[in-house]
Amino acid sequence: MRAIILNGHGGVDALEYVENFPNPECGKDDVVVRVKSTSLNYHDIFTRNGMPGIKISMPMICGLDVAGEIAEIGVNVSGWKIGERVLIDPRNRVEGGLVGETIHGGLAEYCRVKEHQLVSIPDGVSFDQASSLPVAYGTAHRMMMTIG
């Protein structure tokens, strides 16, 4: 699959576009999402820059804010269907992971997550609008409430 991978810390030169990154395998408890939109946020920049406290294995596909369609569902997953429009909550508190940090993120064609990380996208909300909600919206909201 096509992806933008992080091979090391630094500026934009630390990012590499590849066309042959392995597709994620759908485990029995996983959902694979076909990425339709992703937005960049402060955490993606901190990860790329190597901010202390953010530990990742390289190469890593960054991108916390992801929206797309369900492409594959594990056998233990229920309540979701192929083609359903979803956004991904990047936090994975059950397994201690974070999309784009310990789990490959949305700067790729596909992203694998756990079902509890999925949120349905309501009718009338575009993929671009949905992909700005998980982290980018919270950052903007906090700034507006703090600074005014």
Segments predicted by a language model, with ranges:
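Extreme N-terminal starter segment of soluble prokaryotic enzymes
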Residues: 1-2
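Short polar catalytic/cofactor-binding loops
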Residues: 7-11, 38-40
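Well-ordered beta-strand positions in beta-sheet-rich domains
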Residues: 17-20, 110
